[in-house]
Amino acid sequence: MEDEKAILALAALAQPTRLQAFRTLVKHEPGGMAAGDLARALEVPQNTLSAHLTVLSRAELVTSERHSRSIVYRANLGVFQKVALFLLQDCCGGDPEICAPLIESLQPRCPPNRKERNHV
């Protein structure tokens, strides 16, 4: 991942509503959430949320797809994974004794029966 893309993604998440929106979308994977439902869940006006989702979309952290009369947003876990790996690529000078606990703590906590979908 290039520095510029990582900076764009991290900057997009460096705002409370956008961070909360992204985390909510992660919780609703793999199905995503309709924009109106997400606005109600976050208790923000739809037009305000739309602006925030645009920022997250530009950073490629969320994707959107029209479903009938709704737009469904999903967290782009593939890009998020690239950002996390970018931040950790030189972790602890490569010392496995130091890195292992950190990497282990980053393992997904999803229920085992839930299908994981990684979309880019």
Language-model features: locations:
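Residues within the DNA-recognition helix of helix-turn-helix
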Residues: 52
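Short intrinsically disordered, low-complexity segments
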Residues: 15-16, 55, 88
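Beta-hairpin "wing" of winged helix-turn-helix
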Residues: 58-67, 74
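Amphipathic alpha-helical dimerization/coiled-coil segments
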Residues: 1-5, 26-27, 77-120
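N-terminal helix-turn-helix DNA-binding core of bacterial DNA-binding proteins
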Residues: 4-45, 70-80
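Alpha-helical residues within the helix-turn-helix
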Residues: 40, 57-58
